[in-house]
């Protein structure tokens, strides 16, 4: 049996995304869409064991959804209350990804306590939006 990991990066560095504006309690960004052309694996399907979300301090909610041939399949994982200090990998609700599936990563942010824009970047005070799969 083979095993591997892959990720969706919906905003990691400043050149990937505009800064998040300050003072917004629920800022939703459909951060990354992996089109079906990018999931043309050598096999018909892969089994996903787990999904791990990652954001920084103003990240509040994250989810990964699957669409197959234009039909919504479901959420692989939804994190309703993201906490930077308690990150974990969780079992995927969608167990099988098929060749050609489209994946969408959506991240929500709360910048209501900020007075200046929040940049994307590596530092904890910056922000990110990504998901890893096993």
Give the residues covered by each predicted segment.
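Beta-strand-centric surfaces of beta-sandwich/beta-rich domains
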Residues: 1-134
């Amino acid at each position: 049996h083979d095993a591997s990991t892959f990720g969706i990066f919906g905003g990691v560095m400043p050149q990937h995304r505009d800064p998040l504006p300050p003072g917004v309690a629920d800022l939703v960004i459909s951060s990354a869409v992996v089109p079906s052309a990018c999931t043309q694996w050598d096999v018909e399907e892969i089994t996903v064991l787990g999904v791990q979300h990652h954001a920084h301090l103003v990240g509040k909610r994250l989810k990964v959804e699957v669409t197959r041939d234009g039909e919504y399949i479901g959420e692989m994982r939804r994190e309703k209350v993201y906490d930077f200090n308690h990150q974990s990998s969780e079992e995927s609700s969608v167990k099988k990804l098929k060749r050609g599936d489209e994946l969408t990563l959506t991240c929500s942010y709360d910048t209501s306590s900020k007075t200046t824009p929040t940049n994307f970047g590596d530092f904890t005070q910056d922000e990110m939006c990504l998901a890893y799969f096993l």
